Amino acid sequence: MSASSSRKAFVPLSNALRRRKLLFGFGVGTVIGAGFYYMDKNNERRFKRDKDVYFVSNAHAATVDTKTALNKRPSGSLPTRAELLKGMRDEEFDILVIGGGATGAGVALDAQTRGLKTALVELDDFSSGTSSRSTKLIHGGVRYLQAAIMKFDREQYKMVKEALFERANLLEIAPHLSYPLPIMLPIYKLWQVPYYWFGIKMYDWVSGKRILKNSYYIDKEKALERFPMLKKESLKGALIYYDGQHNDARMNLAIVLSAIRNGAKCCNHVAVEHLLKDENGKLCGAQLTGELFPVRAKCIVNATGPFTDSIRLMADPDTEPICRPSAGVHIVLPGYYSPANTGLLDPSTTDGRVIFFLPWQRMTVAGTTDSPCDVSFSPKPRNSDIEFILGEIRGYLNKDISVRRGDVMSAWSGLRPLVNDPNKKDTKSLARNHIIEVSKSNLITIAGGKWTTYRHMAEEAVDACVKACNLKPKNGCMTPGLMLEGAHDWYPLLYINLVQDYGIEVDVAQHLANTYGDRAFVVARMCKMTGKRWPIVGNRLHEEFPYLDAEVNYAIKEYACTAVDVIARRLRLSFLNTYAAHEVLNQVVMIMARELAWSRQETEKQLKVARDFINNEMGQEARMQSVSDVPLNLTKEEMQMAKERFNQLDKDKKDTLRSMTSADTFGSTTIKLMSNGELELAEFFQLYSGLKSGQITQNRLVRYLDELGGEKDKTKPVLDVVRSGGGF
């Protein structure tokens, strides 16, 4: 056979193979497409069918799941903190929980509703640590599912499925604090369309009947219509999928209050001095601070997050540490940075991380980073991490939008409690999920995991307590579907009743309903008359935020003991806007001083501690670092003008502006952070440069300096610190 004939014989065979491959690929694609089409239609029908049932079931207590009396709306007021402490001192408990974050609170609620007498103590405030510093998402973990598919990892698949079940449960048991949020995944390369579409559809499929709503693809035009700030260049389209969002600190508190309503004794600002053991070396209680009284308990649960090892060392000084904390930084930007009802996911940042960009509490939260760190009671956000997040945001937003350092209203660092699994041979490998360790002395340690799965973690921890300490619960786990504080009589239009019945402003009523649920009426009854035709009641703490002075009084009933408890966790103001938090601080402290009978010394202490918290843990100090790094970019004329204004402020003629003088002028600003409380001329020049470059944006300082120079442009609108996106 000649060479030419052999080539002719080969060509039809090659074409046949190609046709078979194309037919096979088409067939597989058709089957997959048909499967997802059926799944979409089925899920959509189920969603439409169940949606109304969901809202009706939460509209009135009479129609909520009545399988257990535990789900009836509790009547009466909460016990006082003094009553809880007395009960803790006088009674003997089945379980003592150390740690008042999401997991510890979940353990207390689970154990108490099983009929086990439970106490909980927290060194600081409920949710004062990692649980209040999250990304505010209730999610299954899209990236974990991606890893499960790519690596055929069954363990990660089970993690995602478990988290998606818990996501649905949280949305059901606290609908006033949580809600579905559409998240956009913008696509800039054509090959990413089928890749991400398949991954997101798998996320829907794993959700099963717990799906929130089906994901879908939109083209470039619709993507820009929905998210106008998005970068237009090379945009192909976007995928929209759904996850949950919540108010994390308030959710944590709702779990604690629900445990207390069911009979648990939970106290914040109580530390464990040391653990008590019986003659057999088994734990039998703990010695607490304050009056140094012992709490007797048959079983002790260590749910202290990043501080896990400190309690483990109390039980066994020779134990090996297992916690390897990682710092995650988030920043808050003004609300105009994102649409009010759509988030954004950057699935692959410049260093391989994932960053979320989400609307939250009428602002925009962005994060997170992931950096190994040391354990700290007061973690501070690093300016380098803040700049990294801003850089990633710039890469996704329209080039016409100037993403400024001065627009960062708040920033915080949360310690993620990554742990090694002591139950495995390779004890240095990080556990992908949570771990439960039972020590020789019967200390039950629950560590790792994430916010979404707190309830499942708590269930497993209580199961371990029952087994290890031979406890006798009256029933099994009752927490799936157990309504949390404020959820029983909540329904989506409850805020209208507040407006009509009490004469409260609409945005304030929405805030009250979505923060306190059916307890919003209690807060409304505590409000004072405004003396105006409208609103009739409800005096705001700050004109730009819906928080009321009556909420400070109610926060005390919710066991707020310090000013930080109020501005950070009962209200979320320090997480949203540090400038506004400084401005309301005096009023908050005065209300608390009156209600709690603080001495003058205690009042001054509370003011100082709260200011330090805002400056150090909420990002003001990092802001000053960024200002000090600004290069001088002033002309000779601008430097002369700055010097004249500096001299006008320097009343003592000592070539420095002291924090006391500055505070008289600017209120509670952060000038005192520079040069150990003094602002020198060189630093004043840097401030001017920051104002010029956009590192610092319009605020009272700018207006005051303009007034000093007699150059105030009355035709130019002066924006409030909130609307301008920050300030010094």
Give the predicted meaning of each segment.
Residues A3-K8, D124, L177-P180, M184, ...:
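C-terminal accessory subdomains/tails of enzymes that are appended
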Residues L239-C299:
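Helical element adjacent to the flavin cofactor pocket in flavoenzyme catalytic cores
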Residues S2-I95, T113-R114:
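Extreme N-terminal leader/targeting segments of oxidoreductases
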Residues F93-L120:
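N-terminal Rossmann-like FAD-binding beta1-loop-alpha1 element of flavoenzymes
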Residues V272-L275, F356-F357, I436:
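A structural signal for short hydrophobic beta-strand segments in well-ordered beta-sheet cores
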Residues Q112-S134:
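Glycine-rich FAD pyrophosphate-binding loop
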Residues V97-I98, V295-G305:
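Short hydrophobic core segments
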Residues S127-K161:
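Glycine-rich active-site loop/strand segments that organize a redox cofactor
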